[in-house]
């Protein structure tokens, strides 16, 4: 069981802001799974709540991954910034997939590199 957060490298934002957005994505996706499939959430949590942060080079690639995950029934959380500090309102910063089965998520993200 794994949850993956994928970040678009192209954005010019500070490390602290990036960390906060990754945390938002991770929490949002976990809560979605908790509400809709508590058994899956509980198993992921019991197994150590594994999380991995990966990177892509473009917004298009990020959105393509989100679309493929949704088509496979994987929970997706898309994080848009409020735009109060470093980026324009609504800028997509990252997405989170899962938690779900490793094999299911790896079919979509297995070629991505760690952030």
Swiss-Prot record:
Class of the enzyme per the UniProt entry, highest EC level: hydrolase
GO biological process: translation
Disulfide cysteine pairs (residue numbers): none
Subcellular location, record wording: Cytoplasm
Alphabetically ordered keywords of this record: Cytoplasm, Hydrolase
Role description: The natural substrate for this enzyme may be peptidyl-tRNAs which drop off the ribosome during protein synthesis.
Family matches, as Pfam families: PTH2
Primary localization class, coarse: cytoplasm
UniProt superkingdom: Archaea
Any one GO cellular component localisation term in the record: cytosol
Name this polypeptide is given: Peptidyl-tRNA hydrolase
GO MF annotations in UniProt: peptidyl-tRNA hydrolase activity
Similarity section: Belongs to the PTH2 family.
Species of the source: Nanoarchaeum equitans (strain Kin4-M)
Reaction equations catalysed: an N-acyl-L-alpha-aminoacyl-tRNA + H2O = an N-acyl-L-amino acid + a tRNA + H(+)
E.C. numbers: 3.1.1.29
